[in-house]
């Protein structure tokens, strides 16, 4: 059974969040076309996302083994167990959807902390002559980044301003996922009318994206 992993990073209720509203429309369309697909959801403001410590690792990006884990204090054992859980869940997915607002030219901090948890040696990356490479090219995977922003960002300056999108694209491609799509909810503005127009414009691309899955 294929798995769809939905990761949201916004404290707003779904009906108030433009990125989460569009992401839900996308998810519903995917599940309508693929009813047997399993959906898992991670809200990065509700799920505990550990901050990494040196004591959690035995080597570069490699989580401690079970013997070393047992020697850690119980609270640190719990943190390592959560990191492993998040990484294993990420690695098992076939389709990924992230819903995030654009904050300060990037994204909210919990998303970076989450990415740090799922980049693990032997699971999502490996090293060859001290050079890292991704392991998630082992099967067909699709990644869709849904991002909302208050302004309409001209495409010609988007690479310079949209640093969050650039980073997510680069790290996902580095992990080995070659199929990366963006679904931008630009121009949510300052009024509800502007927000709804931006949502409708972004949602008009959903059918095309779903057909590519």
From Swiss-Prot:
Please write the reaction equations for the catalytic activity of this protein: 2 a quinone + NADH + H(+) = 2 a 1,4-benzosemiquinone + NAD(+); N,N-dimethyl-1,4-phenylenediamine + anthranilate + 2 NAD(+) = 2-(4-dimethylaminophenyl)diazenylbenzoate + 2 NADH + 2 H(+)
Q: What class of enzyme is it?
A: oxidoreductase
Annotated family: Belongs to the azoreductase type 1 family.
Keyword Chaperone found = no
Cofactor(s) needed by this chain: FMN
Q: Gene name, please? A: azoR
Name of the protein in its database record: FMN-dependent NADH:quinone oxidoreductase
Q: Which GO terms describe its molecular function?
A: electron transfer activity; FMN binding; oxidoreductase activity, acting on NAD(P)H as acceptor; oxidoreductase activity, acting on NAD(P)H, quinone or similar compound as acceptor
